[in-house]
A protein has these predicted regions:
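Extended hydrophobic packing segments that form well-structured cores
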Residues: 365-492
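N-terminal basic/disordered segments at the start of proteins
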Residues: 2-37
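C-terminal catalytic subdomain
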Residues: 284-421
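Long, internal scaffold/assembly segments composed of regular secondary structure
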Residues: 217, 222-308
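Cap/lid and interdomain-hinge subdomains that line or gate substrate/regulatory clefts
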Residues: 4, 9-11, 40-42, 102-229, ...
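Short, acidic/small-residue loops that bind anionic groups at enzyme active sites
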Residues: 84-111, 118-124, 129, 282-294
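Short, well-structured alpha-helical segments in soluble
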Residues: 54-66, 83-85, 243-253
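Periplasmic-binding protein-like
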Residues: 66-75, 94-96, 257-262
């Protein structure tokens, strides 16, 4: 996904060397990594042995525009200068070390395995953050793989550092589950701007007859195709899209990136003249999350997932169980899942059309039509993007600040099955191993909201590393049956 709302990672690598070891060990091993790594990376030629070297190297990578850094211990490394790199460089830093085997065991032994221990100890003493991979010691080929894995982690960290979440309206009544203590946002370095629905309505009216509306309408028609949208509704929706985009640009302030969390019912459709879901889907497909029902941490989670996957995402209700007859007809014997491993993820119509089956259409919100239009011919309840979500690998996840002000998270990898839902909305049949147990002992037990963010690939590894880096102490996942949850009854 190409988006100017997601940071571009510009990597640099600095090799470090302890002065009682041959400096050539670090420099040559660094060059070997450069040859193996397939992406773009600035190869800093200053090898750090002391604090003056450190200042020189950091100045060089900054001058080259690097915003993320690899510190490579080609030998034992100088623990003070190498950790001060993280202090003096304003961006995420990964620390990795060289494995032995590319030389003899006399002059060719670097002891970086040992040096990594001193490095981590010094980072801790200085209260500095450094990203250290699961096993940080490797050959040139292995370190190159670690660097590739670091890129999405760095992208998330840089994104959060520059993010502002913009909200419109309070949470709807009886939707307190989407609570949003802002303390957690500030702990993550994220800014928030909270506005009234009236502010949005005023801005929307000011965009009436905007000369750009026709162009947006044409783009909507091209995206959806003939017979898959309401031509008479397009101008209203285009006007709203321009309103949000202009608001984002005018209200970024000191920040580079934005996400929205907007109130979308009950007053919105009757006052704006449509449901905002399709417009929301268009923005998230371009890298700007618009979370439903003022779900601030849903918007935050969506943004994290976009940076982690470098792709668009969605936000869904963990909505309903799969009927036994659908399981028996279309899942049992075809997929290796129990009925309780499956559920339906649903929202009114905010999932990007590029992640939906080809039969998707702009329709009307059935539930709101019952409530607001008495089930009559739909008018202002139109605007939802409906259809089955296309089969895909997925990661279901969320980062949430709970009612006590503590940041917690969960991650579960799975898939959207190629099985018709036979239902309405933007909806799909999801399958996650041991979902039933995860549902009870994580989602229910720990009081998570009913909204979950969805990335359309397996990015659990990246998200886990990101949450660790951010200092999230509780990172839950769908544990296998062989690993019971603390609250799981052993006599069940």
């Amino acid at each position: 996904m190409v988006s100017n709302n997601i940071p571009q990672v510009k990597l640099g690598i600095i090799a470090v060397s302890r002065d009682c070891f041959p400096i050539a060990l670090s420099t040559q091993r660094r060059e070997n990594i450069i040859k193996e790594y397939k992406g773009e990376i600035f190869n800093c030629q200053t090898t750090v042995e002391n604090e003056k070297d450190m200042l020189k190297a950091v100045a060089e990578v900054k001058e080259q525009g690097c915003n993320a850094l690899v510190v490579f211990l080609g030998n034992f490394g100088p623990e003070t200068p190498e950790t001060l790199i993280a202090k003096n460089f304003d961006g995420p830093v990964m620390f990795v070390a060289a494995a032995e085997g590319d030389g003899d065991m006399i002059n060719g032994r670097g002891d970086a395995y040992c040096g990594m221990l001193n490095c981590s100890y010094n980072l801790g003493m200085r209260h500095l953050k450094g990203y250290i991979p699961e096993y940080p010691v490797g050959t040139a080929e292995e370190v190159a793989k670690m660097i590739a894995d670091f890129v999405p982690v760095a992208r998330v960290i840089l994104g959060l550092k520059g993010l502002k979440i913009i909200t419109f309206g309070p949470r709807p009544q009886d939707f307190f589950a989407c609570n949003a203590p802002i303390k957690g946002l500030y702990e993550l370095g994220v800014e928030i701007e909270e506005n009234s629905e009236l502010d949005l309505l005023v801005a929307y009216k000011e965009h009436a007859n905007d000369p750009r509306i026709d162009e947006v309408c044409a783009d909507m028609a091209k995206e959806m195709g003939e017979g898959c949208y309401y031509p008479d509704l397009s101008r209203r929706m285009a006007q709203f899209e321009l309103t949000l985009l202009d608001w984002a640009e005018a209200h970024k302030g000191s920040r580079q990136y934005v996400a929205f969390a907007d109130k979308c019912w009950p007053a919105f459709p009757s006052q704006f003249g449509f449901e905002p879901c399709y417009v929301n889907s268009r923005l998230v497909s371009r890298g700007i999350p618009v979370a439903c029902e003022v779900d601030v941490y849903g918007a935050l989670s969506e943004y994290i997932g976009m940076c982690a996957s470098d792709d668009t995402v969605t936000l869904l209700d963990i909505n309903n169980s799969v009927p036994r007859y659908i399981y028996d007809e279309d899942i049992k014997g075809k997929y290796d899942y129990k009925l309780t491993d499956t559920f339906m993820g649903f929202h009114c119509g905010n999932t990007p059309q590029c992640k939906m089956c080809s039969s998707r259409k702009i329709k009307y919100q059935l539930i709101q039509n019952r409530l607001l239009e008495n089930g009559c011919t739909p008018d202002f309840t139109r605007g939802t993007l409906e259809g089955d979500i296309a089969a895909s690998d997925i990661t279901f996840y969320r980062l949430q600040c709970d009612s006590e002000g503590n940041l917690r998270s969960y991650i579960a990898e799975g898939e959207v099955l190629d099985v018709p839902t036979r239902s309405f909305g933007g909806i799909g049949i999801f399958a996650i191993n041991e979902m039933g147990r995860f549902y009870r002992h994580v989602l229910i037990q720990k009081g998570y909201p009913h909204h979950g963010a969805v990335a359309f690939s397996h990015v659990g590894k990246t998200l886990f590393e990101v949450f660790k880096y951010l200092g999230i102490k509780d990172i839950a996942y769908n544990q296998p049956a062989s690993l019971p949850y603390p609250t799981e009854n052993p006599w069940k």
